[in-house]
Amino acid sequence: MASTPSLIGLTYAGLAVLYLLVLPLLSLLYVDKRWTSGSAWEKVLMFFLVLFFFPGMVLLAPFMTFRPKPRSL
């Protein structure tokens, strides 16, 4: 059985991955999907998510592309 310090370390590592990678990725995908069609309160929620998960957004931003989809002519 693992000792208490290693369990504490694993817990901190799991929370760090959750805060720095998983939740910012989910919120970036949500913002990308709903930015043009969201209501005013939904945009307030989006701004809060970006502010709250800013360190993770800075880590993920170089790998994300939010270019507009090509239009059909």
From Swiss-Prot:
UniProt GO MF annotations: oxidoreductase activity, acting on NAD(P)H, quinone or similar compound as acceptor; quinone binding
InterPro entries assigned to the protein according to its UniProt record, in alphabetical order: NADH-quinone_OxRdatse_su_L
Reactions the enzyme catalyzes: a plastoquinone + NADH + (n+1) H(+)(in) = a plastoquinol + NAD(+) + n H(+)(out); a plastoquinone + NADPH + (n+1) H(+)(in) = a plastoquinol + NADP(+) + n H(+)(out)
GO cellular component terms given for this protein: plasma membrane-derived thylakoid membrane
EC number: 7.1.1.-
Membrane topology (UniProt): Multi-pass membrane protein
Methyltransferase keyword on record: no
Chief location of this protein within or outside the cell: membrane
Keywords: Membrane, NAD, NADP, Plastoquinone, Quinone, Thylakoid, Translocase, Transmembrane, Transmembrane helix, Transport
UniProt keyword Ligase, yes or no: no
Transmembrane intervals: 6-26, 44-64
Domain of life: Bacteria
Subcellular location: Cellular thylakoid membrane
Subunit record text: NDH-1 can be composed of about 15 different subunits; different subcomplexes with different compositions have been identified which probably have different functions.
Functional description taken from the UniProt entry: NDH-1 shuttles electrons from an unknown electron donor, via FMN and iron-sulfur (Fe-S) centers, to quinones in the respiratory and/or the photosynthetic chain. The immediate electron acceptor for the enzyme in this species is believed to be plastoquinone. Couples the redox reaction to proton translocation, and thus conserves the redox energy in a proton gradient. Cyanobacterial NDH-1 also plays a role in inorganic carbon-concentration.
UniProt record similarity statement: Belongs to the complex I NdhL subunit family.
Protein name (database record): NAD(P)H-quinone oxidoreductase subunit L
Gene source species: Synechococcus sp. (strain JA-2-3B'a(2-13))
